[in-house]
Design a protein with these regions (language model features):
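Surface-exposed repetitive/solenoidal architectures
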Residues: 20-468
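Structural motif
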Residues: 469-491
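N-terminal active-site segment of His-dependent metallophosphoesterases
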Residues: 477, 484, 526-624
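Hydrophobic beta-strand segments
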Residues: 493-497, 522, 871-873
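Short, acidic Ser/Thr/Gly-rich low-complexity loop/linker segments typical of extracellular
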Residues: 496-515, 885
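Extended active-site neighborhood of metal-dependent phosphoesterases/phosphodiesterases
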Residues: 527-535, 539-550, 621-717, 742-763, ...
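Binuclear metal-dependent phosphoesterase catalytic core
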Residues: 779, 783-864, 869-872, 915-923, ...
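Aromatic sugar-binding surface patches on proteins
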Residues: 890-919
Length: 947
């Protein structure tokens, strides 16, 4: 009994030690002191070793508060508040790479009054500098910053002064003001943001600010060379900004320097003043104003992006105005662009005005982008695509002495005011629309573009949004109809919000109740008896849900047709393009693969479709526009699949931070349609919700996709054939191990296998592996595997543009650039690999002994698989022998690779040592021969060789 009592007492002591937490200011002081001395903080941790607040903390006694100097643990405020705190710096001076701080609320009774004295300075209520993760923190306190003479940069933010890693789900409601004087040096600036003042870091650090909002007013006055004032982040640098919104008023007053110079520039943005990384799905409601004795670049979303990047799916609702005494650029989305920035799918509703002075140089005002220019050093131009302006645009005379024919005049445009590029670069302002009023007291104005030089223009924005309405009394918040052009309802068509599926009624109507906080689209599963609506080659079976819509209605008008029983599908894998001028990938996609596919399509008498199996671009998100432009040259409906390289490679924590590019440029990431008798399912099997940059993405289906797949297939009878198309095969992929590549470890494997295992047949197509591969489970279950199902066949397709980063006419396995051609005859399916520049008969390359150097004939049969015959060697029309499987390196590719001297890229495109090679020793004295092989569909291919 005594031992039992001792053990119980010890356990109770441990529980108390692990569960104490921080419940008072004295506890907080003790915790901070222990941190700063490097002592144990276990007594303030819970059982998960997380430091926790257990109550609101009254900070009234904190007269000379000393913050945590450096924190590498996990701190959870559990939504408790810090109250009555008169701060001079943040709670944490620095959160390290391993640090996590969450759930702290700074009460409105708190204030931060910071004074810097010339040195580099950082201040934010939660952290002065963040190298770790801050999430779920809220600030209501006021921040006031002053600096009498800045010699170095100052960074002030509501949550963090500076961010190098991640800030998620944080809010600022407190007013932030900064008044700075200093030296007039270009490198000295003040950066102020509602969430973070500044950001930095290389792209590999995956720095991000996401799902954050600011409602606090921001006011900056300075006489420095640069002011950065942003609703979310001042100078975001390498921090990407996603799913953020600003409702706070932002004003910047940039004054002349001590020597009277007015060369300073105010950069002001509703989301960021300046950025070197992407901004997606961000929204500004706040009024923006730039004034003072200097000029400004001011935009509803960002003042000036300063790198090759994408700004997409953003909306500005707030008024944006520049009224300084020097030339300025004003835009509803972006003030000025001088880099290969791609602005896509953005909308402006705000009033845009230039009311400043611009006597000797150009000033601009426009609904989307004020000014686009192209420095001599640039290798690519800017794109503005699929953007719409509804706001009024105006500019005063500004004392400008030039007329509209002069580039230094004031320019005003509904979409872009002034756009200039070089004739040797691609640049465009295309597929954009304006219905706002455009007025200019002097200079030049245009309904869409004020002036364009060496810039491609034309087209109108897609009408692909549902209409925002109020919910119905029963809570229904998505509804509409599917009809023919004469108004006849189409019954039985499946409609989805990406999770649930419903069928249209007899009159073509449908309705559902959806979680609009995470619903991006309402779309159709296209039946085989309607024409697929396309725009520039892409199916338009969807409507985008408007931002902040409480409910939405979407009507679809379709044209009926007889279902096609016979047709062809081009299975194109991994174009994996980078922008023009990088590594020839875009060039090969443009000048070899796409033209070949279009020529093949044109030679066909029946319907042709294309399914592009992911890795459409290669990490560089601003390649999307050009990829799509080239894909549209294949004049048939093209169904796109998302791959791992189609994600922003900095994606962390949630898939939605990375797939937003695909959704913006293409549409839903999972969807279905019928062609003839077959049901096609497009899936995202790449799970990019990794917890850190050191983790890899995973394979499988996320919860939302699985829910949708179950709903979609509930309307598909089991006697149908299913064609699953994804980037990574959900079942079997090439692997040296017989049992190591069945993907049973993938997320939700058992669930999605159960959904498809009883269908008549399932063909699972994929890219990703950069090689041709076939596997039929019916030949293996019960023999060498227990996974999969006997109705499943897996087909992998080689990279269309050749070896990665090399992009030459043949790939690392010796296969020509190319794609699979799938022939469909009712329910009968066959396929073959079509090399670029070759016909169906070209299925192998045969090398003579003189070429191989070992007295043997070798044949590389790049699409050979189970079900094919053993290749046979013929001499003088007589079979001599079966050839032996001898995997090895393709001689032609080996020689081609030897000419490649890019040491950085060579490791990505080494000759494959396991090419599908067969060999035979010819009869002595033979002068020629022939290799014959028959594929699984009974097609015999021959190739002759001179010995």
């Amino acid at each position: 009994m005594k031992k039992l009592l001792i053990s119980f007492g010890f356990l109770l002591a441990c529980v108390c030690a692990w569960a104490q937490g921080i419940g008072s200011y004295s506890d907080l002081q003790a915790f901070i002191e222990a941190c700063n001395k490097g002592e144990s903080i276990i007594q303030w941790c819970n059982s998960d070793t997380v430091v926790v607040l257990t109550a609101d903390i009254d900070m009234a006694k904190a007269k000379k508060f000393v913050p945590v100097k450096s924190f590498s643990g996990h701190f959870d405020g559990q939504s408790h508040r810090l109250k009555n705190w008169k701060a001079q710096r943040g709670l944490f001076s620095e959160i390290t790479k391993r640090g996590v701080v969450e759930g702290i609320i700074i009460d409105a009774s708190c204030s931060l009054n910071a004074t810097s004295k010339g040195e580099e300075f950082y201040a934010g209520f939660i952290a002065d500098k963040n190298y770790g993760l801050i999430k779920g923190c809220i600030n209501y306190g006021k921040i006031s910053h002053k600096c009498g003479y800045a010699l170095s940069n100052n960074n002030i933010g509501g949550i963090a002064g500076y961010n190098r890693y991640a800030i998620l789900n944080c809010s600022n409601y407190g007013e932030i003001s900064s008044d700075v004087s200093g030296v007039n040096k270009e490198e000295v600036f003040i950066a102020v943001g509602g969430i973070a003042g500044g950001g930095a870091g290389k792209p590999k650090y995956a720095s991000v600010i996401a799902h954050c909002n600011n409602e606090g007013a921001i006011k900056v006055i300075a006489n420095l060379a640069s002011i950065y004032a942003g609703g979310i982040c001042g100078n975001a640098s390498r921090s990407s900004l996603k799913y953020c919104d600003n409702r706070g008023k932002i004003s910047a007053d940039i004054r002349a320097a001590e020597d009277g110079s007015t060369k300073g520039i105010a950069k002001v943005g509703g989301i960021a003043a300046q950025t070197k990384n992407h901004i997606l799905r961000c929204y500004n409601y706040g009024a923006l104003n730039a004034a003072g004795e200097c000029g400004a670049n001011i935009g509803g979303i960002v003042g000036i992006p300063h790198e090759s990047l994408v700004i997409a799916d953003c909306i500005n609702y707030g008024p944006v105005k520049a009224e300084g005494e020097q030339p300025s650029n004003v835009g509803g989305i972006v003030g000025s662009i001088g880099r290969p920035v791609h602005v896509r799918g953005c909308t402006n509703y705000g009033e845009i005005r230039f009311d400043g002075v611009s006597s000797r140089a150009r000033s601009t005002a426009a609904g989307i982008v004020g000014n686009i220019y192209c420095p001599k050093s640039q290798k690519a131009g800017a794109y503005v695509r699929e953007c719409v302006n509804h706001g009024s645009i105006s500019a005063g005379s500004g004392g400008n002495k030039y007329d509209g024919s002069n580039r230094n005049a004031i320019h005003v445009g509904g979409v872009v005011a002034y756009a200039e590029a070089r004739p040797d670069l691609r640049a465009s302002v295309a597929n954009c629309s304006n219905d706002g009023k455009v007025s200019c007291a002097s200079g030049r104005k245009g309904d869409v573009i004020g002036n364009a030089v060496n810039v491609k223009t034309g087209g109108a924005a897609a009408q692909d949004y549902a209409v925002a309405v109020q919910p119905k009394a029963d809570g229904t918040n998505i509804w509409g109809s599917v009809t023919t052009s004469d108004g006849k309802g189409l019954e039985g068509i499946v409609v989805t919000d990406g999770r649930q599926c419903v069928k249209t009624a007899a009159d073509g109507s449908y309705s559902m109740t959806s979680d609009l906080s995470c619903t991006r689209f309402v779309y159709l599963s296209m039946p085989s008896y309607v024409e697929i609506p396309i725009r520039e080659g892409r199916p338009q079976q969807f409507r985008r849900i408007p931002h902040d819509a409480k409910a939405a209605t979407a009507d679809f008008v379709l044209q009926t047709r007889e279902p096609a029983k016979e047709y062809k599908v081009l299975m194109i894998a991994d174009p994996q393009v980078r922008p023009y001028g990088w590594d020839d990938s875009m060039e090969r996609w443009d000048d070899t693969v796409a033209p070949d596919a279009e020529a093949f399509r044109a030679s066909c008498s029946g319907d042709v479709y294309s399914i592009n199996l992911g890795d459409l671009v290669y990490n560089e998100m601003y390649a999307w526009d050009d990829y799509l432009d080239v894909a549209a040259k294949i004049n048939c409906p093209t169904f796109n699949v998302i791959g791992n390289h189609d994600y922003d490679q900095n994606t962390l924590f949630e898939i939605e931070q990375g797939n937003v590019f695909f959704e913006t440029y293409v549409g839903p990431e999972h969807y279905s349609f019928d062609l003839g008798d077959i049901h096609y399912v497009i899936l995202n099997t790449i799970m990019y919700d990794r917890p850190s940059v050191n983790d890899k993405y995973k394979y499988g289906l996320d919860d939302r996709t699985l829910e949708w797949l179950k709903a979609d297939l509930s309307y598909v009878p089991k006697n149908k054939i299913i064609m699953l198309c994804s980037h990574h095969n959900p079942f079997k992929t090439p692997n040296n191990s017989k049992h190591g590549s069945h993907n049973f470890h993938s997320r939700h494997y058992n669930e999605y296998l159960a959904l498809v295992k009883d269908y008549k047949a399932v063909y699972a197509w994929n890219g990703h592996n950069h090689q041709n591969f076939y596997y039929n489970y019916a030949n293996h279950i019960g023999k060498d595997t227990k996974h999969g199902a006997p109705n499943i066949q897996c087909i992998s397709v080689a990279r269309a543009t050749g070896a990665l980063r090399f992009n030459r006419p043949i790939g690392s396995k010796g296969e020509p650039q190319g794609y699979m051609v799938m022939n469909v005859h009712g329910e009968q399916v066959d396929w073959y690999y079509k090399g670029v520049g070759f016909g169906k008969d070209y299925q192998m390359k045969v090398y003579s002994p003189a070429r191989t150097g070992d007295d043997k004939v070798k044949a590389n049969i790049w699409n050979w698989s189970e079900g094919w015959s053993t290749p046979e060697w013929y001499e003088n029309g007589v079979k001599v022998a079966d050839m032996e499987f001898t995997p090895g390196i393709d001689p032609d590719y080996y020689d081609l690779f030897a000419t490649y001297d890019n040491q950085t890229n060579r490791k990505y495109c080494q000759p494959d040592k396991n090419c599908i090679m067969f060999s035979v020793e010819p009869t002595p004295g033979a002068t020629s021969g022939e290799v014959r092989v028959t594929d699984m569909f009974g097609n015999t291919y021959t190739q002759q060789v001179t010995l």
